[in-house]
């Protein structure tokens, strides 16, 4: 499956959570709430999950093989790094005195 879109939202704060991402495949299927986490060995990607009644976490959606996982991780990490290197410009909505 071809990745056709990746969106990343940076999270500022003191937790290890650095951002949240969504990834779209073939303009037909999207996976939301992929977490970007700062671990002891750098950034890692955590697929969306839910907590079970026993306190364990189970992925809601995840890649079936390591090749697909690598593609997803590379796309998200690249987009996240691009966001860090080129933060979006804040728009100025102040009144223009020339009006």
Swiss-Prot record:
<comment type="similarity">
    <text>Belongs to the SpoVG family.</text>
</comment>
<comment type="function">
    <text>Could be involved in septation.</text>
</comment>
<protein>
    <recommendedName>
        <fullName>Putative septation protein SpoVG</fullName>
    </recommendedName>
</protein>
<dbReference type="GO" id="GO:0000917">
    <property type="term" value="P:division septum assembly"/>
</dbReference>
<dbReference type="InterPro" id="IPR007170">
    <property type="entry name" value="SpoVG"/>
</dbReference>
<keyword id="KW-0131">Cell cycle</keyword>
<dbReference type="InterPro" id="IPR036751">
    <property type="entry name" value="SpoVG_sf"/>
</dbReference>
<dbReference type="GO" id="GO:0030435">
    <property type="term" value="P:sporulation resulting in formation of a cellular spore"/>
</dbReference>
<dbReference type="Pfam" id="PF04026">
    <property type="entry name" value="SpoVG"/>
</dbReference>
<keyword id="KW-0717">Septation</keyword>
<keyword id="KW-0132">Cell division</keyword>
């Amino acid at each position: 499956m071809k990745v056709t879109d990746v969106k990343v939202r940076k999270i500022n704060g003191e937790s290890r959570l650095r951002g949240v991402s969504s990834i779209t495949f073939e303009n037909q299927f999207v996976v939301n709430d992929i977490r970007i986490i700062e671990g002891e060995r750098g950034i890692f990607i955590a697929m969306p999950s839910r907590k079970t009644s026993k306190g364990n976490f189970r992925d809601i959606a995840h890649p079936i093989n390591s090749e697909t996982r690598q593609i997803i991780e590379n796309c998200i990490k690249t987009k996240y790094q691009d966001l860090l290197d080129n933060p979006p410009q804040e728009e100025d909505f102040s009144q223009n005195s020339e009006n």
